[in-house]
């Protein structure tokens, strides 16, 4: 008869652990994992939001936070944590929002998970689709990418995620305006942050890393600043917590994601962490230090931003990337 597998006890109590934090050496049960995630999330919210005791506007309306959710584990944990930490404040309103990219077999079930979660917390839920924004559905965009790459040098080598990422950012900006959000919360976890930093290093684009959220210390007029309360929480811990809490979440992967640069960086970051526990934290600490030095060196200068000549969105170009891509798609229709 096979012997039962031994399960480590929680480092803080005698209950069975559900996760091992290799970077800290601790084993945590579900209850203490929740406490650990909540503590780190609460600290980030205090640092990134810095809300006064009464955050209401002069007209009496509440301070509105748009929580971008997708139906996945990260945004599910983000919304529940924010609801637990600041959901009882009468001067703050949490609004959840989801972008429908138009991906058959993927977005519909994940959208339903997002809706179920918002309803269970009694949080307002809003959606916005690419079609409502005047863009093509992503399933249609994907079919035209090869031709666009042949016709435009700037488009050569771009993957579906390149288009979707640009359109999603525009969609979230539009959703933030729709609900009059003061700030937008994104569910990026520690692995996401480390992957982004690594990708930008690979491309020699340190400036892109400097511009990563949170943005509350460097706001841009006309755009709701992004905050990332889960940025110090590893993906594995978020997943374990979501399972322990029984949160509604969609487990499927986007069918258009394979081949994206982030998929490669995901494996590299995982290998780094396996060899050197704490490597992800080191990458993010390095970015924070680079950001601090950049801010000190550029105290008297402001980032140059323009309004897109086509749509009016904030951009560093004359015509924003979203409108450029939209034009490429129009040419191939």
PLM segments and residue spans:
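ATP/NTP-dependent adenylation/nucleotidyl-transfer catalytic domains that generate, transfer
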Residues: 1-67, 95, 208-333
């Amino acid at each position: 008869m096979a012997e039962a597998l031994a399960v480590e006890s929680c480092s803080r109590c005698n209950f069975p652990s559900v996760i091992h934090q290799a970077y800290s050496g601790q084993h945590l049960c579900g209850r203490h994992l929740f406490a650990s995630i909540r503590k780190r999330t609460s600290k980030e919210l205090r640092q990134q939001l810095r809300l006064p005791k009464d955050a209401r506007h002069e007209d009496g309306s509440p301070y509105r936070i748009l929580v971008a959710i997708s139906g996945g584990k990260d945004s599910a944990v983000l919304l529940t944590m924010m609801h637990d930490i600041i959901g009882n404040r009468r001067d703050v309103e949490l609004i959840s929002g989801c972008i429908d990219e138009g991906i058959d077999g993927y977005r519909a079930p994940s959208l339903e998970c997002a809706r179920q979660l918002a309803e269970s917390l009694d949080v307002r839920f809003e959606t916005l689709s690419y079609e409502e924004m005047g863009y093509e559905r992503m399933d249609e965009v994907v079919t035209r990418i090869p031709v666009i790459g042949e016709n435009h040098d700037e488009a050569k080598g771009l993957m579906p995620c390149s288009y979707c990422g640009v359109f999603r950012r525009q969609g979230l900006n539009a959703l933030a305006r729709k609900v009059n959000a003061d700030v937008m919360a994104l569910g990026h976890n520690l692995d996401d942050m480390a992957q982004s930093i690594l990708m930008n290093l690979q491309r020699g684009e340190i400036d892109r890393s400097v511009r990563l959220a949170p943005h509350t210390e460097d706001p841009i007029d006309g755009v709701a600043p992004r905050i990332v309360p889960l940025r110090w929480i590893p993906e594995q811990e978020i997943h374990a917590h979501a399972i322990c809490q029984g949160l509604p979440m969609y487990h499927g992967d986007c069918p258009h994601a394979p081949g994206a640069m982030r998929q490669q960086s995901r494996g590299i970051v995982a290998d780094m962490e396996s060899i050197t526990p704490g490597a992800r934290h080191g990458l993010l600490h390095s970015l924070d230090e680079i950001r601090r030095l950049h801010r000190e060196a550029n105290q008297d200068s402001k980032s140059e931003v323009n309004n897109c000549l086509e749509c009016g969105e904030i951009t560093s170009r004359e015509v924003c990337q979203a409108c450029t891509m939209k034009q490429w798609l129009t040419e191939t229709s």
